[in-house]
């Protein structure tokens, strides 16, 4: 295993500008938290190297700076079919929140695989990689008349997660056709209401959050306020642990969601407390160690970004 250089990975931003509110923690406390985060990344890497699939191991090494983003993206692109779709890349098998449930619910493998590819590229910050063009063409070719993706025949809500995630992730790119987003937006706007995201409804909350964060829509401002409040409420009442809360923020590509006031330092402390002694996260989830790999990768990426925000 090549050594991952963690120096600098978890260095936070510059000191607050004059006139801004002082940080809640002292410099010594922030420094100690960064050191703890670096140790957590080392332990998480060991866990993923032991239990993760080959592509997942490459992804985590890339996030830690041991491999280039171009190398990882090329490996992902190599799986792409001629029609622009992707086969299953292992995120659902690794226990990725939402994706694992979509797999069980019967989302077509080529649709789920394409969603996995978009998530993996998004985590790397590669929203404009050339292979996304083909993925967008494929997804538009199979988009249902009502603007959704997912198993046909069920209630509209059964297609919410796939539709919100796919349209939201594509909304960050430069290649998606407006009519694809408009059709998905008409569907999502027609079913959105606060009850859809309250309580333990992480998939719905996250799918709506990703879509309304990245796609212009008449409901976006008000919906994001509800989403932010429900995310914070779910986190503070422990309906969602820190890992799930962070994964929503990662999908939305933002540590600041309207309506939510989540302190990066406190969220990082809670996240690190969820790491098990074997270095992995989601210790009490169903399944074996292999299904804890993606939650561990999520927590590691969250650790990096939260540490930079200190």
What do the predicted segments below correspond to?
Residues 1-310:
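Preference for long, amphipathic alpha-helical scaffolds in soluble/luminal domains
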